[in-house]
Amino acid sequence: MEKRVKYKSFVKDPGTLGSLELSEVMLLFVPNDPKSDLKLKVQTHNIKSQKYTKEGSNKPPWLNLTSKQGRSHIFEFENYPDMHACRDFITKALAKCEEEPNKLVVLTPAEQLSMAEFELRFKLLRENSELQKLHKQFVESKVLTEDEFWSTRKKLLGKDSIRKSKQQMGLKSMMVSGIKPSTDGRTNRVTFNLTSEIIFQIFAEKPAVRQAFINYVPKKMTEKDFWTKYFRAEYLYSTKNTAVAAAEAAEDEELAVFLKPDEILAQEARQKMRRVDPTLDMDADEGDDYTHLMDHGIQRDGTNDIIEPQNDQLKRSLLQDLNRHAAVVLEGRCINVQSEDTRIVAEALTRAKQVSKADGEITKDANQERLERMSRATEMEDLQAPQNFPLAPLSIKDPRDYFESQQGNILSEPRGAKASKRNVHEAYGLLKESILVIRMTGLSDPLIKPEVSFEVFSSLTRTISTAKNILGKNPQESFLDRLPKSTKDEVIHHWTSIQELVRHFWSSYPITTTYLSTKVGKLKDAMSNTYSLLDAMKQSVQSDLRHQVSLLVRPMQQALDAAFQHYESDLQRRTAKIT
């Protein structure tokens, strides 16, 4: 369980914002500020008592935990339901500790986890929602023990994974402006499918949108209304009708936030320009501008992307979007937050940007040193030797002038002057020698049997042809994208669950102990339950999607069938051996 709280060491303490993570054996508080050293870890069996404010007492929802050492830990929650949920969770954990007191004193070697390893396991479960689902499904249901579950993930718990986890996660190369909605031809409505990855990318590329979300949601509008206005502004951008955009911006001040230039990005650009070499002549690049020529320029949605000076406040260019998108992709994921709460993601990203901004600011001494170093490297024209250029510097406005001037030079060169001479006889000899070797020794046996490869090829051909008929000609669209979100998540979860079960099943053979026999029996029952869930899922989907879902489910059922067949044959062999 995880809740957003404010930790207080005493009553009048202003508090530290962070997240409270609860398990049956430990309570962990992690502050939002990554530079803060305030981290709290409390063993559940060390909690002596808990006090809380009553609902309706005009006091904030506080939960005061007192340890057996006499220390008080006060947590202020956002609302009373969160506080009551945590209080009930701690009460159940304390009751379990009282029922099994021996387990608190005498621990098996597998249960004697160090604090660092426990924190790492907790961190992995918190950051990986799919891993958390598997842990809840198999460990809490007693199909696997805690030790068995983590035994197949030693790389995640090793030192190498700790070092690799510091690497920043990348972002997809797809631009935010390239998100296309689905259109309903009957109601003339467009629907955008927003995922947590897309929301994070929007917040990273557009700081003004991120700040507007923090300011407006939920004080002035709901999250749905916010994204509706955002995509309305994006639609106005795509139409290139600046007059309509200006009119709607004048009537709706919230919509105007998305249409105005991003002041946060402009401020960041001004700060970056202070670090640019002042001797750099950026006007020299103007001669490379070919966008005004025929057959040149950048096309966007079928028309040239040109900004008119009088309307540049209400229109972005494709170059601006590309440059910003490239900068965000190169920067990577600067925060490590996996949460369904959009506000948590926005606030965490804002804090990370503020920290990086503070780290990147140039101090006065560093700026002075940079200027002095550049002044020493700057050349003075009157002290340099005269440079007599044989030709005048080129400033080509039209590339055709260059290519037409080079055509005469090419025709004047003797034919074949630069052509490399190939030894035809040598190549023929090598080819003839290779053919003789094949005739003498013959070809080796194929790695894959022809009938197997033909069956796979035929299956792929049927699948691809069926998918093309259903999905159309859009290569970026997959069948999973057409499924309802609940069905898509269910298919993915079943696939990861089956992988987990099958991995533990096959690693338990050969069965040499009673422990392995019991473990295989539990896994077999869990796989049977999953098999029935797959059949139920196939029957529950729409009729037009049932065939494609069956194709997705078929490899899962084949993997389970192979495990069942091996289980039955091995059980018969062991039974016959005993009798």
From Swiss-Prot:
Keywords: DNA damage, DNA repair, Nucleus, Repeat, Transcription, Transcription regulation. The keyword Repeat applies. Its main location: nucleus. Gene3D superfamilies: 6.10.140.1200, BSD domain. The keyword DNA-binding does not apply. One of its GO terms (biological process) is DNA-templated transcription. GO terms for cellular component: transcription factor TFIIH core complex. It is found in: Nucleus. Component of the general transcription and DNA repair factor IIH (TFIIH) core complex, which is involved in general and transcription-coupled nucleotide excision repair (NER) of damaged DNA and, when complexed to CAK, in RNA transcription by RNA polymerase II. In NER, TFIIH acts by opening DNA around the lesion to allow the excision of the damaged oligonucleotide and its replacement by a new DNA fragment. In transcription, TFIIH has an essential role in transcription initiation. Belongs to the TFB1 family. This is General transcription and DNA repair factor IIH subunit TFB1-3. The lineage of its organism: Eukaryota, Viridiplantae, Streptophyta, Embryophyta, Tracheophyta.
